[in-house]
Amino acid sequence: MGIKIYKPTSPGRRHQTCSSFEEITTSTPEKSLLIKLKKSGGRNALGRVTSRHQGGGHKQKYRIIDFRRDKISIPAKVASIEYDPYRSARIALLHYVDGEKRYILAPLDLKVGDTVLSGPEADIKPGNALPLKAIPLGTIIHNVELKLGKGAQLARSAGTFAQLMAKEGRYSQVKLPSGEVRMVLQDCYATIGQVGNVDHEKVSLGKAGRARWLGKRPKVRGVAMNPVDHPHGGGEGRTSGGRHPVTPWGIPTKGYKTRTNKSTDRFIVKKRTK
């Protein structure tokens, strides 16, 4: 889980860093848990770009991850820690005692040979999944469900974690990585511990080509465009854009809040800080 630094043998190598992958135990994924996903290139069903700066990238196969953790009271042994091209976190292959195999997000300090369990009676140790009502206050958690039975939606990226702050009635208060404190049903499941691969944020791509391998296309600045393409475009020579920053469609950006009000806003106890 360390960071590998290279000697500056070329301009692209000079600032490049990458993960040492020392926690990876196998390079061969479980075939039964792989599916093919077709790349969209950021286009919708009409062929129009709805998400810019996406396209290309290395061919990948999607690993089916168990975000529900619904095999209650059935122990499983960690068979391997693997790389997943679709996410920043590492994944762990579980072999259940009934013969089934599943992938989960690999929490920090989970090792091959460890036993994990789901259910209210599980121990408070990394990798075990419990309902929030069975988790002590102050516990570091990740992979948190928002809706009962839907599967985990919160705190799934490398190095992230949430914290159980309080319990009141049917709801628990969970502090999320953004600083937001939110009420979540006490019957919703969460996994103990912090997501692994905590050094992911220290990785520097070093060159544009490495971003293209990941399916990321260039982001062209509005001031470098023509007036027909962007509100900041045009002008003689270099310009500042001449107005407060806006999107290509004229909506204020860079700090302007565009989040719409939702019926679930009543579950937010404290707004996000970052």
Curated annotation (Swiss-Prot):
Region: Disordered, residue numbers: 223-258
Keywords per UniProt: Ribonucleoprotein, Ribosomal protein, RNA-binding, rRNA-binding
GO BP terms in the entry: cytoplasmic translation
Gene3D superfamilies: 2.30.30.30, Nucleic acid-binding proteins, Ribosomal protein L2, domain 3
A GO cellular-component term linked to this record: large ribosomal subunit
A Pfam family annotated for this UniProt entry: Ribosomal_L2_C
GO terms assigned for molecular function: rRNA binding; structural constituent of ribosome; transferase activity
Disulfide bonds: none
General function of this protein: One of the primary rRNA binding proteins. Required for association of the 30S and 50S subunits to form the 70S ribosome, for tRNA binding and peptide bond formation. It has been suggested to have peptidyltransferase activity; this is somewhat controversial. Makes several contacts with the 16S rRNA in the 70S ribosome.
NCBIfam families for the chain: rplB_bact
Family assignment from sequence similarity: Belongs to the universal ribosomal protein uL2 family.
Assembly and interaction partners: Part of the 50S ribosomal subunit. Forms a bridge to the 30S subunit in the 70S ribosome.
Protein name according to UniProt: Large ribosomal subunit protein uL2
Source organism (scientific name): Pelobacter propionicus (strain DSM 2379 / NBRC 103807 / OttBd1)
Gene that this polypeptide is encoded by: rplB
